[in-house]
Amino acid sequence: METDGKTLRRGWTTGTCAAAATKAACAALLTGEFPYPVDVELPSGARPAFSLATEEKGENFARAGVVKDAGDDPDVTHGALIESTVRRGEPGSGITFRAGKGVGIITRPGLPLPPGEPAINPVPRRMIETAIREVAGENADFEVEISVRDGEKLAEKTLNGRLGILGGISILGTTGVVIPFSCSAWIHSIWRGIDVARATGCTHVLGATGNTSEKAGQAVYDLPETALIDMGDFIGGMLKYLRSHPVERVTIAGGVAKMTKLAQGMLDVHSKKGLADLEALAVLAAEAGGDDNLAVAIRQANMVAHAFQLAESVGIDLGAVVAEKAWVTAAAALKTPAIALDILVFDRQGALKGRTTSTPSHQPAPSSFGDRNRRT
């Protein structure tokens, strides 16, 4: 992968690091020696090798640690020490997992593992099991305890608390590899948030583009925390998942700029995907009753927030029109009349600037405003 002419390095997931640490600890428990380096098998069949950052051998256990290298991805767990402590299990117990310090415990239903389990996801578990069997053979009986140094603090920068994963981070990974600046991890967290909301009985979820819109939307509807989905820029990712994992009602809440992009037909509202089209916004202002002077001023505005201020100063409700057009885009992506949909548009201070009523979504004709959405 390249950006600005620079090739970006891929990295390794916490699951891969945990598997490598476990294999080394298991080998040391059986032979008295830590392998160096230690290789593990990824789901793809590739076999990366890792150096050990920590080694410890006790009477009934062995512990090894691997420092996570996320490559050039701005991962909050980059540089974290992932350690595995391996002990012999009871005969016939198989491979069991425990959460050590810094690894979370699942407390809510709806996640891939039931409440009470350590937050070591299914693919990392399979990788760890494979790693153990490579050194101990089939029918191995071991207890594996994964810990992460400063995992409790790292977890504060993740969505674990929202998902009901308490006490630390999750051990994650589906491929074993971290792709720099991939949106995959965020989209998967959106999906898990919807799963938890459904499993805890939420019939109305609110997807927000940021903290301000989430808090403001919460003030409107007084929803439980499990109903709040931090969708960020990935509106389409949330709506597409809701097609096959429906709830009765979904609210999309966002700031004026991101909701203007949604109104223009963009389902990924990150700045890298395109800018809000002030020309199209001027057309909307005219549809709302604005005169030519307002249209000219909006075309010359510094940003969308400025355009909203200009419209408001002359009594034009631009927020209502943007909310309506954003609803059209979102309803087309949702593709089901079974889910009621509404839009909330907020300014940077959290003041409500536009909203739609909760209306069963359908597949309407494309908006003319949405056809003007590719100015960069």
From Swiss-Prot:
Locate the region Disordered.
353-376
Q: What is its EC number?
A: 2.1.1.195
One example of a Gene Ontology biological process annotation = methylation
The answer to whether keyword Transferase applies is yes
Q: Which keywords describe this protein according to UniProt? A: Cobalamin biosynthesis, Methyltransferase, S-adenosyl-L-methionine, Transferase
Q: Where is the composition biased (Polar residues)?
A: 355-366
The pathway is: Cofactor biosynthesis; adenosylcobalamin biosynthesis; cob(II)yrinate a,c-diamide from sirohydrochlorin (anaerobic route): step 6/10
Residues spanning the signal sequence: none
One Pfam family, short name please? CbiD
Tree of life domain: Bacteria
Reply yes or no: does the keyword Disulfide bond apply: no
Which family is annotated?
Belongs to the CbiD family.
Q: What is this protein called?
A: Cobalt-precorrin-5B C(1)-methyltransferase
Q: What is the lineage of its organism?
A: Bacteria, Pseudomonadati, Pseudomonadota, Alphaproteobacteria, Hyphomicrobiales
Name the gene behind this protein.
cbiD
